[in-house]
């Protein structure tokens, strides 16, 4: 019989609410340890003791599950003696098994059964919907998935749903954020910078949702400018309505390349292009109609590619959406703010005292520039959405521009200027197909699919067992591209390597999918001899006290840490934080297969181990979904 008292322990008002929302299983144990520290040293408040609890090291260097450095509390007396006093006064509790002193540090070991039951119950409760729960009440991020397991327990026609909520929290409840990312230029290549912005931005949008924020995903297209005049002239000469309908992005690029080549020897092309763009800006019906057709059909194609990447947008905005009136208003405000000065006929803002150089806000010919449109666009967005934060996911090459943009908004007196944030990243070097040619993202995705398909075919027996090789190879290829991009710090440049990223060995995307597939197979391979009870009955039916091996404890502590990993990633905006966790969990599970065997074991032990593996699959799946990946169950 479990000694665990009613979950959770009594709330302590001074602890931030997000610690007590059942999103981090270890928090209740930290709270128990913090209350004990406070009981011995009343001058240390419970919330300070709580914040001082750090996860202990695993493996040979392990001292305990939690470690706290008493020196941080600035207590009177020698830290080593204080640590010994704390250890001497300890008596086991339903949550805490033992504590010990090591120099100025105190370490806590948790009650094994309480640890396993709390963590597994929480993963189970926050992952699986029971038949009694409201299936319509899922958050957007929950990423509802259907599972045939246990379908016979539900009303006819309804599959058991999964809410995949473990690791999420409500710290951002009531707040809204706009994440602007991807932002390709119509009729120009979807290059490596756009790829990184797309991958990292989609992850950040998911990360905000996982932390309780309402998220608006915005794609700010490069959809205005003289290049549309060139396109119009080119389309008149080389265009095909049929090709445009089939694949607007590729066809417009082909037209753009051809007409630009013609323009090298025929200056009249550029004159006609300028005339067309003037008509666009004047609102000419024919010019705007043709531009709109180019834009709309390009967005249709973009949506197909984004859907393939498991990425979507709530709003397709763009340079064209920032009205002339808004730009004029922004310029008037700039001039009225007293920060603008004239320089050789142009208007500038001198930001040298902020170490940001000078920035032009209007050219000497009177035309607007990017920063003016950005100012007008940001103001329009705030008026429309009243966001609490807006994040621009843009390459580090634009660091100066974004810093100038934010500073000018601040100097103009916009109170929301300090809610804008630039999340930057380094460049991809050598992104191309294996033949050395690539212009569009879709070409890279098609090539990665081909490569993974070739790798899969090398194992003929396994290949025959794959239900849909084309689907599987596509998802594996996309995973390979994304994980290669996200596994290092985002500010670092990286080299695009086919052989490395498509390998099933080492820290690669295919390896993560393989780990998930293997975890997904455990239930299938052990049925019907060992079958988990329905989610609502697991806690009462499974004896977790049988999970006594050190390897099982290593797995459960890693699963328990996932909510804290999500919070850490939110502080740094580093997808590598989640990637590293997913790799670590996959490695630990890989080393557990020979120790924590399910097949052929006594039924109760097999059931407990099966629940542990299924929980690991649920957590790894959540990490992959957070990274915008689609976990595979078979390959």
Indicate where each model-derived feature is located.
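Non-catalytic interaction-recognition regions
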Residues: 2-117, 128-635
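Short, charged, solvent-exposed linker or helix-capping segments at domain edges/interfaces
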Residues: 117-123
């Amino acid at each position: 019989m479990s000694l665990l008292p009613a979950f959770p322990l009594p709330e302590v008002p001074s602890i931030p609410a997000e610690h007590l929302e059942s999103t981090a299983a270890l928090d209740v144990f930290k709270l128990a340890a913090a209350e004990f520290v406070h009981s011995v040293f009343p001058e240390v408040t419970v919330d300070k003791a709580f914040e001082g609890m750090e996860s202990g090291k695993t493996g040979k260097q392990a001292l305990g599950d939690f470690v706290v450095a008493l020196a941080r509390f600035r207590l009177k007396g020698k830290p080593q003696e204080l640590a010994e006093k704390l250890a001497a006064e300890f008596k086991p509790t339903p949550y805490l098994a033992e504590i010990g002193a090591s120099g100025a540090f105190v370490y806590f070991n948790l009650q094994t059964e309480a640890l396993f039951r709390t963590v597994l119950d929480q993963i189970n409760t926050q992952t699986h919907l029971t038949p009694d729960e409201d299936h319509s009440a899922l958050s957007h991020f929950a990423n509802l998935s259907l599972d045939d397991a246990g379908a016979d327990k539900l009303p006819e026609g309804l599959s058991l749903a999964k809410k995949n909520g473990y690791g999420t929290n409500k710290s951002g409840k009531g707040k809204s954020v706009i994440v602007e990312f991807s932002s390709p230029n119509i009729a120009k290549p979807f290059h490596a910078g756009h790829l990184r912005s797309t991958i990292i931005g989609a992850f950040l949008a998911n990360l905000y949702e996982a932390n309780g924020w309402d998220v608006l995903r915005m794609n700010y297209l490069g959809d205005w400018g003289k290049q549309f005049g060139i396109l119009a002239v080119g389309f008149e000469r080389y265009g095909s309505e049929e090709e445009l309908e089939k694949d607007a992005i590729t066809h417009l690029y082909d037209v753009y390349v051809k007409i630009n080549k013609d323009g090298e020897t025929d200056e009249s092309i550029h004159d006609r292009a300028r005339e067309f763009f003037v008509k666009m800006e004047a609102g000419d019906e024919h010019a705007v109609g043709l531009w709109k057709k180019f834009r709309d059909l390009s967005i249709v194609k973009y949506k197909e590619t984004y859907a393939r990447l498991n990425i979507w947008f709530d709003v397709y905005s763009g340079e064209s959406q920032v009205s002339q009136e808004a730009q004029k208003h922004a310029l008037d405000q700039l001039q009225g703010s007293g920060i603008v000065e004239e320089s050789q006929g142009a208007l500038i803002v001198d930001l040298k005292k902020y170490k940001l150089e000078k920035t032009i806000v209007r050219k000497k010919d009177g035309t607007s520039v990017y920063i003016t449109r950005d100012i007008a666009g940001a103001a329009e967005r705030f008026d429309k959405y009243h966001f609490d934060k807006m994040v621009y996911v843009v390459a580090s090459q634009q660091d100066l521009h974004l810093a100038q943009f934010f500073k000018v908004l601040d100097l103009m007196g916009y109170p929301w200027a300090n809610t804008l944030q630039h999340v930057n990243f380094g460049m991809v070097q050598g992104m191309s197909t294996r033949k050395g040619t690539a212009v569009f993202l879709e070409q890279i995705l098609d090539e990665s699919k081909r490569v993974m398909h070739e790798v899969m075919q090398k194992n003929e027996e396994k290949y025959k067992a794959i239900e849909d090789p084309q689907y599987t190879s596509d998802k594996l290829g996309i995973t390979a591209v994304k994980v290669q991009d996200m596994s290092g710090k985002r500010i670092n440049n990286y080299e695009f390597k086919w052989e490395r990223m498509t390998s099933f060995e080492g820290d690669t995307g295919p390896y993560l999918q393989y780990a998930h597939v293997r975890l997904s197979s455990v239930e299938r391979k052990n049925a019907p001899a060992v079958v988990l009870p329905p989610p609502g009955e697991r806690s009462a039916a499974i004896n977790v006290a049988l999970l006594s091996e050190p390897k099982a404890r290593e797995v459960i502590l890693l699963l328990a840490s996932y909510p804290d990993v999500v919070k850490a990633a939110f502080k740094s905006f580093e997808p590598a934080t989640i990637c590293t966790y997913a790799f670590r969990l996959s490695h630990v599970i890989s080393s557990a297969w020979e120790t924590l065997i399910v097949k052929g074991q006594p039924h109760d032990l097999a059931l407990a181990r099966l629940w542990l593996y299924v929980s690991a699959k649920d957590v790894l799946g959540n990490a992959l979904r957070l990274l915008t990946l689609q976990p595979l169950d078979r390959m």
